[in-house]
């Protein structure tokens, strides 16, 4: 008597893959968010997250940059974005904000990272898990962390502290996706 046919095997494989993907996605945000929706900078993001891109904020006067913003996405977030056109629930984005130093080089005026100012962390939340927390809304968790304290946010309300910078990107789920070439591949 045949116990397992090709149909049962295929169903088993699909269930295993779906379970693995669900666990992987839910674990992406777990280390970053506690039960009350309080966030912190993920400790291992430089080792485990994928680089998305860098933005240069130009100097107020003259040439060069005043800041560099270097952005990373949690494991699996880029692959999911490439497949479905948006970040999946639980995806974590970390933006490092560096003061920039500028100097003349043989290639022209250049700006390079100098001192870390802090981190901006966003966690995708399409399910509205933390409705009573003022750092959650519009499908994301939002928090700024000063350099030196990756565990304590200085943000108090995403609407007043974070959202205004993202209004031009509202049509792309509040993320400036045009600056991340890896999302287009």
Go through the PLM ranges and name each one.
Residues 19-21, 99:
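N-terminal low-complexity, intrinsically disordered patches enriched in charged
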Residues 1-7:
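Positively charged n-region of N-terminal signal peptides that target proteins for export
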Residues 24-26:
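Boundary at the C-terminal end of the N-terminal hydrophobic targeting segment
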Residues 10-19:
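Bacterial N-terminal signal peptides
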Residues 28-36, 41-54, 58, 65, ...:
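Sequence context surrounding c-type heme c attachment/ligation sites in exported
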Residues 68-78:
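Short, structured beta-strand/loop micro-motifs enriched in basic residues and often containing a Trp
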């Amino acid at each position: 008597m045949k116990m397992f046919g090709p149909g049962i095997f295929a169903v088993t494989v699909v269930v295993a893959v779906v379970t693995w993907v669900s666990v992987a996605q839910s674990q992406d945000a777990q280390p970053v968010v506690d039960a009350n929706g309080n966030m912190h900078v993920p400790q291992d993001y430089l080792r485990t997250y994928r680089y998305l891109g860098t933005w240069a904020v130009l100097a107020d006067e003259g040439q060069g940059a005043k800041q560099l913003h270097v952005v990373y996405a949690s494991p699996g977030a880029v692959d999911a974005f490439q497949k479905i056109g948006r970040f999946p629930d639980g995806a974590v984005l970390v933006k490092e904000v560096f003061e920039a130093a500028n100097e003349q080089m043989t290639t022209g005026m250049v700006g390079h990272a100098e001192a870390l100012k802090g981190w901006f962390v966003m966690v995708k939340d399409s399910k509205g898990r933390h409705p009573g927390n003022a750092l959650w809304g519009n499908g994301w968790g939002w928090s700024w962390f000063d350099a030196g304290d990756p565990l304590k946010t200085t943000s108090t309300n995403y609407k007043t502290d974070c959202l205004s910078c993202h209004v031009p990107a509202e049509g792309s789920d509040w993320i400036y996706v045009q600056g991340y070439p890896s999302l287009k591949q």
